[in-house]
């Protein structure tokens, strides 16, 4: 079981580092967009505080193996890993100076934030894929956006310079 715990710790380290890196990249794209639909930021909140700080791989693996060992009985009783890199809350906040958690925003603001994140990810994919076009399918977005945000959505689509399909049941 010790070798399995070591493998879990090593893979968890790589997942943690990757997740942190791509969250930073998405946040940079969200900050650098000139026509953001809604300005927002993503924060990762791990239940296991070991994942709170970036530390060297060897130290991380060593500390995580110790935690896995201490929690073997709990994990056995619950029939799952309780301290995994998967135990995370993803918090999204709207705004730049006075940030508001997404859970306190209107459903329209939440949808606008989601669209902003989708465009940030699409931009990242396009940049990392030799500028090849991405294909976006945006379903029922117009029904939830006011005129100002609809214009911003159209501008985002133009700036992305890729294929986009907007679907919905209303004529807007």
Question: Whereabouts are the PLM-identified features?
Answer:
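Conserved NTPase motor "head" modules and their coupling/switch loops across ABC/AAA+ ATPases, GTPases
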Residues: 2-135, 144, 148, 152-163, ...
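Walker B catalytic acidic pair
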Residues: 139-141
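H-loop/switch region of ABC-family ATPase nucleotide-binding domains
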Residues: 167-169
